[in-house]
């Protein structure tokens, strides 16, 4: 199935719509860069990136697989949605919602599993909520 673009109206999106898209793309780009960096770091240093004791009882022998998950789910996915949004693809509207909800879910699981730093986790949960809310506004506007 081919991706569809937003219909051309001649004047482009209204200023409010452009600001909304810029906000979504900026937040998703921030999340993507940090997910790619964090995931790459965990994969490159699977036994030293974080204390191994945090993996006790999880079934993980190292931080490699959590790093892969972080890289793909928190790094690649938001990046793909941000690129889709900049290209005007309609799929980005659903993507924003998935990224926002996914980031909130990721942080909730992370907070239950391994609390490293509350301020950072609260910040990323807030970013996830912001992406979700802005994504809902974008979807209703479209």
Question: Which ranges hold each PLM region?
Answer:
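Topology signature of small-to-medium multi-pass alpha-helical membrane proteins
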Residues: 2-142
């Amino acid at each position: 199935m081919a991706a569809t673009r937003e219909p051309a109206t001649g004047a482009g999106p209204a200023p409010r719509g452009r600001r909304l898209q810029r906000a979504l793309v900026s937040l998703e780009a921030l999340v993507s860069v940090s997910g790619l960096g964090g995931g790459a770091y965990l994969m490159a240093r699977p036994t030293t990136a974080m204390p191994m004791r945090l993996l006790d009882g999880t079934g993980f022998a190292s931080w490699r697989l959590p790093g892969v998950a972080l890289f793909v789910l928190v790094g690649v996915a938001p990046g793909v949605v941000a690129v889709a949004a900049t290209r005007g693809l309609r799929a980005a509207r659903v993507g924003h919602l998935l990224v926002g909800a996914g980031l909130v879910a990721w942080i909730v699981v992370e907070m239950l599993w391994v609390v490293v730093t509350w301020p950072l986790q609260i910040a990323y949960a807030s970013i996830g909520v912001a992406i979700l809310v802005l994504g809902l506004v974008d979807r209703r506007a479209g």
